[in-house]
A protein has these predicted regions:
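Single conserved hydrophobic/aromatic residue that forms the stacking wall/gate
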Residues: 1, 215, 219-228
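Well-ordered alpha-helical segments embedded in enzymatic catalytic cores
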Residues: 17, 21, 77-84
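Gly/Thr-rich phosphate-binding beta-strand-loop-beta motif of the actin/hexokinase/Hsp70
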Residues: 30-57
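Short glycine-rich, Thr/Ser-proximal phosphate-binding strand/loop in the N-terminal lobe
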Residues: 52-73
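C-terminal extensions
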Residues: 195-214
């Protein structure tokens, strides 16, 4: 009995920590009024770039190959291509995903930005769950014409702009902020994380001009919002 009691207490503590970490992630300050370039790093398949405007609308998608094993010609072309997209769309911030090839990509971006004549900053963004989102039904509906990796770059850019609006599209268990998540009660964990997401959204509120269309909003309500 004592062992079961200790296990239950440990489970509750792990679930509570997961919930608190998720809340902190969801309630990060948004970055308003900036054009952001999402940079999804990779080696062999190239780095995916996505430019989104101040409202999160996708303006441009591109792939560059700044890292080996790409050919010398491709690596040489990556810098000018990156600077061109920065200038063409007057990008304010670069959001670099923290996955594979992140460190090399950070060095590449920092070096290229030295040649840009205005202030453009970069930041490393936690991309946990971006691949889950980009392969999801929600992402396919939102971006039917984009490849999975291109959707990831968009998600990385938007996470910097509005973490809450982007992260609510992903199963909370996929954002990688918990411990022992597969060892605890999945039902209790799901209930706690759903509660955290709901309270975070209620605390911040929803901008219907930019919020994702959700299935639990009825068609008449949606049409009413649009006509209003």
């Amino acid at each position: 009995y004592k062992r079961q009691e200790l296990t239950e207490k440990a489970d509750e503590q792990a679930i509570a920590i997961f919930g608190e970490n998720l809340r902190n992630l969801l309630l990060q300050s948004p970055l308003k009024g900036k054009v952001v370039l999402g940079f999804d790093p990779a080696y062999r398949t190239g780095c995916k770039l996505a430019v989104v405007d101040e409202t999160g609308k996708v303006l441009a998608i591109q792939v560059i190959y700044p890292h080996k094993p790409a050919t010398a010609a491709k690596r040489e072309a990556a810098g000018p291509a990156f600077k061109k997209i920065i200038e063409d769309y007057q990008v304010d911030m670069v959001a670099i995903g923290n996955g594979t090839a992140s460190r090399e990509s950070e060095l590449f971006v920092a070096e290229q930005l030295k040649a840009v004549k205005r202030d453009v900053f970069y930041v490393i963004v936690n991309e946990a769950g971006a691949s889950v989102y980009s392969a999801s039904e929600v992402a396919r509906k939102e971006f039917p014409d984009l490849q999975v990796e291109e959707r990831s770059a968009v998600s990385i850019a938007r996470r910097l702009q509005d973490p809450l609006a982007e992260l609510v599209k992903i199963d909370p268990k996929a954002v990688g902020v918990g411990q022992y998540q597969h060892d605890v009660s999945q039902k209790r964990l799901a209930e706690q994380l759903d509660f955290v997401v709901e309270t975070a959204v209620n605390q911040v509120g929803v901008d219907v001009n930019t919020a994702l269309s959700l299935i639990h909003i009825s068609e008449p309500t949606r049409l009413g919002m649009i006509s209003y």
